[in-house]
Amino acid sequence: DRMFDRLKAMGQTACAITDHGVMYGCVAFFDAAKAAGIKPIIGCEVYVATRTRFDKVNRIDGNNHLILLCKNETGYKNLIKMVSAGFTEGFYSKPRIDKQLLEKYHDGLICLSACLAGEIPKALLAGDYDRARQTALWYRDLFGAENYYIELQDHGLEEDQAVLPQLIRLARETGIPMVATNDAHYITKEDAKMQSILLCIQTGKTINDVDRMEFQTDEFYLKSTDEMYDLFSMVPEACENTNKIAEQCNFEFTFGETKLPYFKAPDGMENQE
């Protein structure tokens, strides 16, 4: 409720849920958003295997992040199939999907290139611009020019500053649209300390441990429209594209209807039998 109160106070009309690798919270999020008069956008920040979801070799088979948002019911059905396969077939430290699944189940989805843990930012940080470009073009060709976006973020990290101009260059050279996002893990800047405490609890560390997992800045909160336009004043179209994406995403859950699973009848028999 506090999150939606904050969104309404900032004049926001839509909000997406993109939990890492899971979709457990989607129904509760949808209900709460609807009750608050905010348009809910259902999605997931999936883990994409570096090779295939079946490859599970230590120190070789990691993952890259990718944002997937549901445009419609087809997209939702495809997304839950992939997320489920991530657990039943691709689990290796994280529930991983792969490009084979994306090729099969990409219809009805909008794709964003993700945060610093995405395949494209990783390639850029490694100094491999050509690989980043090839990857971006692969995703654009798969999802379609109107459904794939280069994601721009700026949380004040050194890596953000290194990657951001290269992402803008990549988008302009390929004609792939950009979208500005903020990796919101808490509601206000003041919540950053509480986030650090929760991470300590999660990882079994204390706030004084020098090697504890932490967000290096306090910029991972829900930012206002003005804050985002200030951050990305050099590419205002990236902020405007957030509205375009929100308009494209129109999936809604339907409650109160009995939906039985479909079972194919054995050969020579009808379903009624």
Set out the residue ranges of the language-model regions.
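Phosphodiester-processing cores and adjacent nucleic acid-binding clamps
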Residues: 1-273
